Amino acid sequence: MSYIFLIIGFFLLIKGADIFVSGASNISKKLGIPSVIVGLTIVSLGTSAPELAVSVISSIEGSNEIAVGNVLVSNLFNTLMVLGVTTIIMALTIKKSDIKRDFSINILVTILLLILTFTTLLGGEDNYISRLDGIILLIGCISYIIYLILSVKVGKTTSENIHEELALESTNEVNIFKSILKLIIGVAGIIIGGQLVVDSATFIATSLGMSEKLVGLTIVAVGTSLPELVTSVVAAVKGEEDIALGNILGSNIFNILLIIGLSSAISPIAVSNNLIFDFVFLIVVTLIIGIMIFINK
């Protein structure tokens, strides 16, 4: 029965995220928010909503290692699998400075998380990501969003069409009440789905003798990364290479700054020494992909 609930949970997570993105994007356009902000924030936040739900619920329930493991492998999945599948569908030619900027931020926030984690590990008894660390990450998240808004205002960002091809309705066709209803239904699906996934995965792991870390690093992380995969593949098929890569980068950034930040602010996250290898591996992979992007002409 737990496996059935797990499948239902994943379905609600993915469908909820899809409905959330649709509703939030339409509301943003109706209110006149620039499309670039919709793409870099609403889309990325929407596809990261499953990870957010799973990690926050895990922190509230005390299953902290699921929160960390979920984000680590979700980012690895985004960087390797989602980017890999996307480039198979369409070769990505990186021309815009915005993408390189966001990739630099992606690398920096990953290193920041490693530094915060190493600091707690070196403290001996304080072997966790503290609430203060979480607040620092949340401040970084807010700063990133503010920077995006300011960069649009001063004309630094040129990706004005970043999300128009991903099923955004035109302003005249937007029904604000219908969009709000979509937003509510989407959030409900994400929350309920996240609860089902955490409870089912934890029960299955316990019955099979698996650790919480292993669960977070496998089935939960990959399942909650499916919205990123679907969104980027759709973008690649439609020829929107900047959207495809931008969604991956934005999701990775919010996974660390928002999800780990909020999760640790709710409850300090216990950090196993074994997770340091996962952190380092993620940074190495990110740097390698980053070098490939920066040398791309």
Specify the residue positions occupied by each region the protein language model found.
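Hydrophobic alpha-helical segments, chiefly the membrane-spanning helices
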Residues: M1-K297
